[in-house]
Amino acid sequence: MFVSIPNIRKAVVSLSVVPLLAACAFAPGMRFDPQRPLDPADNASVPKITPITPDLVRAGQTQAQVQASHENADVGPLLAKATPYRIGTGDILSIVVWDHPELVFPTQTYSIGSTYDLASFGGAPSVSGYVVSTGGDIQFPYAGVIKVAGKTQNEVRDEISRGIARVVKDPQVTVRVLAYRSQRVYVDGEVKTPGQQSIDDVPMTLVEALNRAGGINTTTGDNSRIRLTRGGKQWTLSMPALMQQGIDPANILLRGGDIVRVEQREDSKVFVTGEVVRPSTVLPRNGRLTLSEALGEAGGVSPVSSDPRNVYVIRRAAEGEPQVYHLDAKSPVALALAEGFELKPKDVVYVDAGSLVRWSRVINLLVPTATPLIGAAAVAK
């Protein structure tokens, strides 16, 4: 039986009608369907979609300001004025009584007592001097056992002067800490030189500790998420937010045993996918990232394949179900809303494809299938 090529073409077209009518459903690639239930067993579990409107943006900005104020209010216990260093257990002292070399520690000289390089001996156990005992005291000739823990260098100097006054007329005493070993803080995470740091006569503020650690790694460190742990309590500090609220991070005074950790920027990344020029992950700057900035980092919505009316932000809520926000970005004015909409860590920004693009993708799938049929008919003829 002879079948003409026109008839075969008609048959191919007829067979193609059914899938083409459902092109959107069969189109390859990802697609956001607001009616698709999250749980296949529960048809009512469709995601709730919240339009991104000026009111929503204003409410989000107000909430962010209130949250920042509460977080900054919590740093009150960390703010303190610097005070003179107080000697502690394990510190090594240099004590010199001028013009009385017999009272100088056997391995020390007058020059050690006056011009010793403290920085090069920061806690080294080989430094010779008077080691503060676990009981917080030292023993000095003619003065006997002296309680020095918790006192400043000047207070210890005055006490030694009074103790030796009966054998030394008008004593001139110099007391200095040679090695600071009683109090340490620990700096970890995304800094250049993590490790422990001894608290010395330079006030150990948060800024000082970070500077001694070489500063925050500008590539991987997140200066908006610095965790400070003290006595079982933890604070999350944001340098930009503190300064914006008028709080100087240099006024945050650390104590012995404090742990400072700079978190990774990578932990706060946002995913941009769908019909954008460069699907990618985007990292925040100074703890902030807006929808407009995220789209800009991804090259913007694709002018060829995207449907700007369907820009979505998918966010995981505390209860586990996703929150979905929708922006109609067809008009450039909508970019002002996108600039005011703050993203959160691990948000997913998705730009849907246009219906014509999905149709085209189905056609591209069907054409390779239909071509062999037409070719076979031509051979049969």
Swiss-Prot record:
A lipid is attached at C24 (S-diacylglycerol cysteine). One of its GO terms (biological process) is monoatomic ion transport. InterPro entries: Poly_export (IPR049712), Poly_export_N (IPR003715), SLBB_dom (IPR054765). Residues 1-23 form the signal peptide. It comes from the Bacteria. Keywords: Cell outer membrane, Ion transport, Lipoprotein, Membrane, Palmitate, Plasmid, Polysaccharide transport, Porin, Signal, Sugar transport, Transmembrane, Transmembrane beta strand, Transport, Virulence. It is found in: Cell outer membrane. A lipid is attached at C24 (N-palmitoyl cysteine). The keyword Ion transport applies. It is a multi-pass membrane protein. Its main location: membrane. GO terms for molecular function: polysaccharide transmembrane transporter activity; porin activity. GO terms for cellular component: cell outer membrane; pore complex. Belongs to the BexD/CtrA/VexA family. PANTHER family: POLYSACCHARIDE EXPORT PROTEIN GFCE-RELATED. Probably involved in polymerization and/or export of exopolysaccharide EPS I which functions as a virulence factor. This is EPS I polysaccharide export outer membrane protein EpsA. The gene is epsA.
